[in-house]
């Protein structure tokens, strides 16, 4: 399967902000963007005025990188959001946030979305008591996500849980760290999500 193999820290520098792709490193002073907050490459420090199209494209790339999707995957999510009732941009973010790998990450079962995706693929996650190994599966309100019994002793999962305890869990989730399980209480409202994302630029880009 195709995947983005670009170094994660370079991806953050390319977008000019932390995308939280490397787990705990993103919360430490070791994060490269703290020292080099400019795009990578020979001419990275040059200031360039972007066209409207370039701004829209950069925002789409940023959101894709945050959620770890390839272009075709992201476009398919957008098409689904566009067909739903309501505001397309809000629908888009709700669909992205409802992915099983993203929910597992937000519950603290993986230190990053990419690690959470691996955990899902390796049959370490149960959804409503049944094995679930498709990262793109959309979780519904009321669904119960938990770590499979055989995976509860994995060191990387334990480390992720300890790190998650030091951070706040999104309000639309409820997590039992002792039993490694969590409840997807409701779909997040736009006001609950990151204000650094401008999904309207993606809508403008794909509407052309």
From Swiss-Prot:
One of its GO terms (molecular function) is structural constituent of ribosome. Disulfide bonds: none annotated. The keyword Magnesium does not apply. CDD domains: S4. Residues 98-159 form the S4 RNA-binding domain. One of its GO terms (cellular component) is small ribosomal subunit. SUPFAM superfamilies: Alpha-L RNA-binding motif. GO terms for biological process: ribosomal small subunit biogenesis; translation. Keywords: Ribonucleoprotein, Ribosomal protein, RNA-binding, rRNA-binding. Part of the 30S ribosomal subunit. Contacts protein S5. The interaction surface between S4 and S5 is involved in control of translational fidelity. NCBIfam families: PRK05327.1 (NF003717), rpsD_bact (TIGR01017). Belongs to the universal ribosomal protein uS4 family. One of the primary rRNA binding proteins, it binds directly to 16S rRNA where it nucleates assembly of the body of the 30S subunit. This is Small ribosomal subunit protein uS4A. The gene is rpsD1.
